[in-house]
């Protein structure tokens, strides 16, 4: 019966791992076992250039995922040389290129990369391309390939509450003025688009707002992966992600035209989103622009503009960390870009509780320890039931071994005597499994809550752990993880099969190797959980006398 129990556990564990890996791949993540090689650095968008057909056509054409949008640009008129303008606030440093009037580099000043430099989100460099673009279609109008002229004015927030810049271009009978407003303490850039018909005939311009980036993954680990790619939200269809693979295969779908919603680009810990004004009709599109270069966007028809008339519209551009409370306050559904995995309903409340604990303790590492202790206390009755069952099984081990020896050649008789022994001693051989199975969703939810939380970036714990989002630099926590797992196996009943026993002894080593590459915050959670489990199991064993004696064989 012990062998069957162990086999069931192995099958169950393997099934959980394989299901998790399938879920990873179904949601656009890399497989843990057979990762798909990433395509080389994007060939699109070298600095100062754009691919052919880079300006979108109308949404009904562009929405056909995987196809290349038709060019909408005409012959370029004489234009001034472009320049780069840097706007600085307390949270952002934005480099705006007048060639297109777009932010070609956005640094998050309070978010550091692993080298201690400001995190770069938008970028147009040799290594990567990630841009928020806008312009007009429906004619030979100013777009993100047109050179704009920048208005004079302050470029630094200083002691003020906001700083703004207006960039203007005139082309094809349409004058477009883009105004960006950067505010203190905000990752949202308020944007205003003023269109004036300075020609002699009516025009029908459409404003497009798009996020374009290469398909390269960021901050990925060999043993876990997170989603990178476009996402869209509307009041009707709600939130859904679009994988680069689906775009390549022509399987990507976007919502029907509506008057609500936004588009986003998501990566681990960070996101960007174009959010148009409320109750304005919009159409969505997503496609591949060039090799390994993708975009998702919104088109907003501005109606007919008579000669000499003007029309204006607004939008907000968010670019920053996935801080749930902040995202909720910006627009409905934006907090969904934070990926809690398939146990969101459990993970979100757990992270809410973790935030409350952090407000008291002021240290994310100790907050993880405290939350793990609280969860362990909540599940104490279930865990106690499991450990009592395992302790009794360990107590019966000599008698079970004797039964196996007596009935080596008669499995049926052996199983009958085993069942009689279980009934006599009132032991359920699966009693140690079910309580643990019930707890697995909570532990998996906390795993995802920690993995997805940007708050762990750069957050220290003690001594050598300076960043809970990166692996332990000295591998102390993974070693403690292996030791704690080894101690747990010693407290459990010893498998009767020598090969089985060796496998159980090898598992701590295998798991510790995997945890060498996990973020320190996740490993800290598992170490604390294991140590609490050891303390609880040891105390129950001691209470039942299992640590000091074993039932005599009969």
From Swiss-Prot:
Residues 40-66 are annotated as: Disordered. GO terms for molecular function: membrane insertase activity. InterPro entries: Membr_insert_YidC, Membr_insert_YidC_N, YidC/ALB3/OXA1/COX18, YidC/Oxa/ALB_C, YidC_ALB_C, YidC_periplasmic_sf. One of its GO terms (biological process) is protein insertion into membrane. The keyword Ubl conjugation does not apply. It is found in: Cell inner membrane. The chain crosses the membrane at residues 3-23, 360-380, 430-450, 468-488, 508-528. It is a multi-pass membrane protein. It comes from the Bacteria. Keywords: Cell inner membrane, Cell membrane, Chaperone, Membrane, Protein transport, Transmembrane, Transmembrane helix, Transport. One of its GO terms (cellular component) is plasma membrane. Residues 40-52 have a biased composition (Low complexity). Interacts with the Sec translocase complex via SecD. Specifically interacts with transmembrane segments of nascent integral membrane proteins during membrane integration. HAMAP family: YidC_type1 (MF_01810). Required for the insertion and/or proper folding and/or complex formation of integral membrane proteins into the membrane. Involved in integration of membrane proteins that insert both dependently and independently of the Sec translocase complex, as well as at least some lipoproteins. Aids folding of multispanning membrane proteins. Belongs to the OXA1/ALB3/YidC family. Type 1 subfamily. This is Membrane protein insertase YidC. The lineage of its organism: Bacteria, Pseudomonadati, Pseudomonadota, Betaproteobacteria, Burkholderiales.
């Amino acid at each position: 019966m012990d062998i069957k129990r162990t086999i069931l556990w192995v099958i169950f564990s393997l099934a959980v791992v394989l299901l998790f890996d399938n879920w990873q791949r179904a949601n656009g993540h890399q497989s843990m076992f057979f990762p798909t090689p990433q395509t080389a650095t994007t060939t699109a968008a070298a600095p100062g250039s754009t691919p052919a057909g880079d300006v979108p056509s109308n949404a009904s054409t562009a929405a056909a995922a995987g196809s290349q949008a038709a060019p909408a640009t005409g012959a370029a008129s004489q234009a001034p040389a472009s320049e780069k303008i840097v706007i600085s606030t307390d949270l952002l440093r934005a480099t705006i290129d007048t060639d297109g009037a777009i932010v070609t580099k956005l640094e998050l000043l309070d978010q550091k990369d692993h080298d201690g430099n400001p995190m770069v989100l938008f970028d147009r460099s040799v290594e990567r391309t990630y841009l928020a673009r806008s312009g007009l279609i429906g004619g030979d109008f100013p777009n993100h390939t047109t050179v704009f002229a920048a208005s004079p004015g302050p470029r630094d927030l200083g002691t003020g509450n906001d700083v703004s810049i207006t960039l203007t271009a005139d082309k094809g009978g349409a004058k477009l003025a883009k105004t960006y407003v950067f505010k203190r303490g905000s990752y949202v850039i308020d944007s205003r688009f003023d269109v004036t018909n300075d020609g002699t005939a009516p025009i029908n311009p459409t404003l497009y707002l798009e996020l374009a980036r290469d398909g390269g993954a960021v901050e990925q680990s060999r043993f876990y992966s997170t989603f990178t790619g476009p996402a869209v939200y509307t009041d009707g269809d709600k939130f859904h992600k679009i994988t680069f693979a689906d775009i390549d295969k022509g399987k990507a779908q976007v919502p029907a035209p509506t008057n609500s919603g936004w588009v986003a680009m998501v990566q681990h810990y960070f996101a960007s989103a174009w959010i148009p004004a409320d109750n304005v009709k919009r159409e969505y599109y997503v496609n591949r622009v060039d090799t390994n270069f993708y975009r998702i966007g919104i088109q907003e028809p501005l109606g007919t503009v008579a000669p000499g008339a003007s029309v204006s519209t607004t939008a907000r551009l968010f670019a920053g960390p996935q801080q749930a409370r902040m995202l909720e306050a910006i627009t409905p559904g934006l907090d969904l870009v934070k990926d809690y995995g398939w146990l969101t309903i459990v993970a979100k409340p757990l992270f809410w509780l973790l935030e409350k604990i952090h407000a008291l303790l002021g240290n994310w590492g100790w907050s993880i320890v405290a939350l793990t202790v609280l969860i362990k206390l909540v599940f104490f009755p279930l865990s106690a039931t499991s450990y009592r069952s395992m302790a009794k099984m360990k107590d019966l081990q000599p008698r079970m071994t004797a039964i196996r020896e007596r009935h080596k050649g008669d499995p049926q008789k052996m199983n009958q005597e085993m069942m009689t022994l279980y009934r006599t001693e009132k032991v359920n051989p699966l009693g140690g499994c079910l309580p643990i199975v019930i707890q697995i969703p909570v532990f998996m939810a906390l795993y995802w809550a920690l993995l997805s939380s940007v708050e762990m970036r750069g957050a220290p714990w003690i001594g050598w752990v300076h960043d809970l989002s990166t692996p332990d630099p000295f591998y102390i926590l993974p070693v403690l993880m292996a030791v704690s797992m080894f101690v747990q196996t010693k407290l459990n009943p010893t498998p009767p099969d020598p090969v089985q026993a060796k496998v159980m002894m090898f598992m701590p080593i295998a798991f510790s190797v995997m945890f060498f590459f996990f973020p320190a915050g996740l490993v800290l959670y598992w170490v604390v959980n294991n140590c609490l489990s050891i303390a609880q199991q040891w105390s129950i064993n001691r209470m039942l006398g299992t640590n000091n004696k074993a039932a005599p064989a009969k």
